[in-house]
Curated annotation (Swiss-Prot):
It comes from Pseudotsuga menziesii (Douglas-fir). This is Unknown protein 14.
Amino acid sequence: RIISSVAVAVAGTA
């Protein structure tokens, strides 16, 4: 899902 991609992106940024 798109939300999953966002979560992964945020985790990667953090």
